[in-house]
């Protein structure tokens, strides 16, 4: 039983790709990040080199993986308990794991790794993964309607994504190339009221059977009017129409309002994850 670490994306995909893809719901973020690195290049998330790893069990079968695109946290897939223990030990010995900015894993795994890290840690974020069990219309229906974002909307999209990132403490700024890509497949919707955009929602290209909604953003002055529910309903329909059989999203557990909105739209909890960072 062992972890193998590498900076070679091709080697990671060959070794860990099938195991990670076998659980497309739980491993949604690892799948979308690896897809972006394949399509947009190894520097898709910044100039620091990403690294990867996979867990091989006692029977010689690969049973999970990890990846990290600094300065973002290490992402750990669903893995057996013994893999978490061994990864905790590797935090002190594996050069590629030195200088981690954080670890994002299923809640119990994040707790175990925080204990094993050998340094003070704190929880930077606690999130819940939801899957859409059956789409329900927002009640009451918000005023206005949805439309696809277009190239002419880019300045607004950049402004709103940057505002979302600042609120969510996400590193980096909006990428026009990424936004253009999402526009190209109908992956960004705007909710309009009286001819003006009031809310935004997006989804990634379906990978395997799953697409993930996010981000969803409404400017602070326009919140509390149901616009986020309206645009999330519309983008969920669009994700299904794009070919996904599973539509997913993450929420911040510290935000009961958004969690309530998604539950009322028909999303159901799958699992909780946490991001631990050096204190």
What are these model-derived regions, one by one?
Residues 81-91, 214-220, 224-241, 259-264:
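Conserved acetyl-CoA-binding loop-helix of GNAT-fold acetyltransferases
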Residues 57-63, 68-143, 276:
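Acyl-donor-binding surface of acyltransferase catalytic domains
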Residues 118-124, 263-272:
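Conserved acetyl-CoA-binding loop of GNAT-fold acetyltransferases
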Residues 97-106, 209, 239-251:
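Conserved GNAT acetyl-CoA-binding A-motif
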């Amino acid at each position: 039983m062992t972890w193998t670490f590498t900076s070679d994306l091709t080697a990671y995909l060959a070794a860990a790709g099938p195991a990670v893809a076998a659980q497309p719901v739980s491993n949604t973020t690892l799948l979308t990040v690896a897809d972006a690195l394949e399509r947009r290049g190894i520097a898709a998330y910044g100039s620091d080199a990403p690294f990867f790893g996979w867990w091989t069990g006692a029977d010689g079968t690969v049973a999970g993986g990890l990846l990290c695109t600094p300065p973002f946290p290490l992402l750990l897939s669903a893995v057996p308990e013994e893999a978490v223990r061994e990864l905790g030990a590797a935090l002190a010995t594996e050069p590629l794991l030195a200088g981690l900015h954080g670890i994002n894993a299923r809640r119990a795994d994040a707790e175990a790794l925080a204990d094993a890290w050998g340094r003070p840690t704190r929880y930077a974020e606690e999130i819940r993964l939801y899957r859409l069990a059956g789409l329900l219309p927002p009640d009451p229906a918000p005023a206005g309607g949805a439309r696809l974002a277009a190239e002419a909307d880019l300045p607004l999209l950049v402004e709103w994504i940057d505002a979302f990132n600042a609120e969510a403490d996400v590193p980096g700024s909006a990428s026009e190339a990424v936004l253009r890509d999402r526009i190209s497949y109908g992956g960004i919707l705007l909710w309009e009221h009286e001819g003006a955009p009031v809310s935004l929602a997006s989804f990634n290209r379906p990978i395997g059977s799953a697409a993930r909604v996010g981000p969803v953003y409404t400017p602070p002055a326009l919140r509390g009017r149901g616009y986020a529910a309206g645009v999330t309903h519309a983008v969920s329909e669009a994700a299904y129409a794009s070919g996904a059989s599973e539509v997913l999203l993450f929420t911040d557990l510290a935000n009961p309002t958004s969690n309530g909105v998604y539950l009322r739209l028909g999303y159901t909890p799958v699992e909780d994850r946490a991001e631990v960072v050096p204190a």
